[in-house]
Amino acid sequence: RAGRLRFNCDFDKAAGIYNTITDSYTEEAEGYWGLILCKYGIEYADNASGKKVPVCHRISYDSVMDDEDFELVMENSDSESRAIFREEAKIIEENRKKYIQIAESEQPYDIYISYRAKDDNGDKTAVSEIAGHLYNKLTSARYRVFLSEAALKGKKQSDCEPYIYSALNSANVMLALGTSYDDYNNVWVKNEWNRYLEIAEKNKNKCLIPCYKDVDEYDIPKEFAGLKVCQLGNDDTFNNIMAEIADVVKQESVNQPAPE
């Protein structure tokens, strides 16, 4: 089950199962390796020659080679398996370093808009229209805003992580938009707000603001409990969001877009 979840890029749920495995079977190298793959968001995809290669969806400043779980992989592997794990880890580590370089070259953002752009049929979602409207309003107010449709336009999914990572770490506010249970529980959207909550836990200057309409209390992620929310779809929506943002992002520190 953990492998299936990881295959579907549901890394948090997969990691929970791998943790259960390693708690019960402390000498199971595959369990620790699974935790590594989840931590760095590794998906195996075909390259141009058809070979399966690791694609990273969660970069970190922490080296793979120095990770405690990787050390446990090494301790609990035979010599043949150890060599295979080390080669895979080196590839992931090289990708991590490359992605960090790209991320550090990016301009910082003030606001990250998290939303589900397309539904399971590939059609544009209702919440994507709201996201686009907010993006236009906020950029007009001179905020630098990360919106995936704009920031990642023309990029392959396998190349997006450095830009997402940079935006998640630099933005002082995340607006988590939703009009349904599926909007918040889409794997990629959940990946965004989960990671941002982890960052905000370490940096109290960062703030996640759930913004929703037509979502009942049972469909709101439990992780949002205690957070100040904004209701979408009424006349005061934008003013309320702007007021919340202004409390977090001081105007003098706004990362204004460079002039054309």
Q: Model-predicted segments: where are they?
A:
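A conserved position within tetratricopeptide repeats
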Residues: 15, 22-23, 39, 74
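Alpha-helical linker/edge segments of TPR/alpha-solenoid repeat scaffolds
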Residues: 38-104
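Conserved N-terminal substructure of TIR/SEFIR domains
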Residues: 90-177, 197-207, 236-260
